[in-house]
């Protein structure tokens, strides 16, 4: 009888437990509404940490909107007894205001609205971005005058940006709170970052990965002819933003990337049999974190030594690990010229007009390398002058220093030599000295932050392509494809869900907003984490520089027989296009511990914390009187439930001897 009673009790407990779990999930779904959001994450440095993190389990509070000077000043006398989640209109989200608010009154977290953009120039980057890793670490120039260094601050509370539609809703609900109406609204912000202390500690504990990615280089030549000089046409591919999922970086990188890929499309149609120079197009990753991609490439050109080839792939090295050795075709001493496009999306109106009454815009030459650089400037100037209605013209900078640029990685290596062989270097920008980009490193460096005059974009592609063809030995006869330029511009500056992505990619992006934050390198030297934007650019470059095809009925790239080939519509496309590791030389992989370690602190040290998930959830809060009523009601319900249970127990025990 006792055993029977035991099973009955167990059965009742299981039924009640299942019901409680189901009810708990149902109640939670009714209490909370998840919001589309973009977190501020945490990055560890050599000496500490930057970015944001919530407490374990998240932080919550009542929403308080800051959208005017009055609401900002009222915040400090706000009598709300509960914790506060500050909702920032974008105009009030900057380093000065956030630090003042946090230092004077408890702030449990922050939500930033994106429905209305800033009405003033602002950059969360430094005034001289990554100066310590460049060519002039002691420079007094401030290239980025709107910068306040907000990105490099550390905050012990969570911050999220909200997507457009969500921002409109939260703005309205926060206004209800401020007006003192009920029900009030609160939010729970959960972005707990596992990393802590500094980069060394975080790596040792296994809670971080190095910031990095994959650079891309490409050539029309099937094999690099080592007897020919090399023209290196390049740009930084990555961008930054305080909320890294919103790092569109249209003027930082996206516009120039549009130009470079359009140049590949243009130059694929020219007669390259007359070229007496090799032309290599390179797109460096993780440049915004200390010129990581370009520095790594230069170091590998000069110092990489494979001691053991991969037995299954003679173009891959097993020790030290290197998946693709094709870069060994490139000799550093063969580099004849470097041409870099760096922030070219906001050229200044010169005040002049073309014969057909179009505005003419100025691009700026930043030369280095004496006579070689002068030759490059001459060719580009002659190319634009050869077009009667060209809407771009060039002027030479008034500065003696190069702006922050990837070319510095090559020049630093040249300067180490006792008898340097100067490489003619030309950096082309939209600014002479201080950036024309008012939102460098900010979420508002988007498609609305660039020159939208299509004729200027077309003319850049035409003039740049003609110049490269002439420098390589061609006759300068080029024809641009206006439709391709328009389409690829949309892909890289507005929506990564364009037709070219559909054609070339087997996967589709979760977020349509182009995001050029480099991300993390990966868990080991051969296990990379490559974002869809980087993969798309690689496939686009491969498609545009293909030198042969093979109809194999392939279903994936694995069905094609080289790492520089891709499968498109059941056809393998072969190209001399390759990934190259973009990871700081500060790191080395310890195989015995299966973890990254810091081996050279003279190079950039940035590692990103791991996290399980991030979320923002909205909930309602009743008035004080309502909360008291719910508490009393709950206690009454509890007492009644306990009484009923005791009565049933007594009844069953007496009547059926069950308990």
From Swiss-Prot:
- Say which domain of life the source belongs to: Eukaryota
Q: Name one Pfam family in it.
A: Nicastrin
Where's it mainly located? membrane
Q: Give the UniProt keywords, A-Z.
A: Glycoprotein, Membrane, Notch signaling pathway, Signal, Transmembrane, Transmembrane helix
**CDD domains referenced in this protein's UniProt entry, alphabetically:** M28_Nicastrin
Leader sequence range is: 1-22
Q: At which residues is glycosylation annotated?
A: 94, 172, 305, 389, 451, 475, 550, 553, 600
The residues exposed to the Cytoplasmic compartment are: 649-659
**UniProt-listed GO biological process terms:** autophagy; macropinocytosis; membrane protein ectodomain proteolysis; Notch signaling pathway; phagocytosis; protein processing; sorocarp spore cell differentiation
Q: Matching Gene3D superfamilies, A to Z?
A: Zn peptidases (3.40.630.10)
> Where does this polypeptide localize?
Membrane
What is one GO cellular-component annotation here?
A: plasma membrane
Transmembrane stretches in the record are 628-648
Q: Which residues lie on this side of the membrane: Extracellular?
A: 23-627
Question: Its topology with respect to the membrane?
Answer: Single-pass type I membrane protein
Q: Which family does it belong to?
A: Belongs to the nicastrin family.
Subunit structure, as described in the record: Homodimer. Component of the gamma-secretase complex, a complex composed of a presenilin homodimer, nicastrin, aph1 and pen2.
What task does this protein carry out? Essential subunit of the gamma-secretase complex, an endoprotease complex that catalyzes the intramembrane cleavage of integral membrane proteins such as Notch receptors and APP (amyloid-beta precursor protein). It probably represents a stabilizing cofactor required for the assembly of the gamma-secretase complex.
Name of the protein described by the UniProt record: Nicastrin
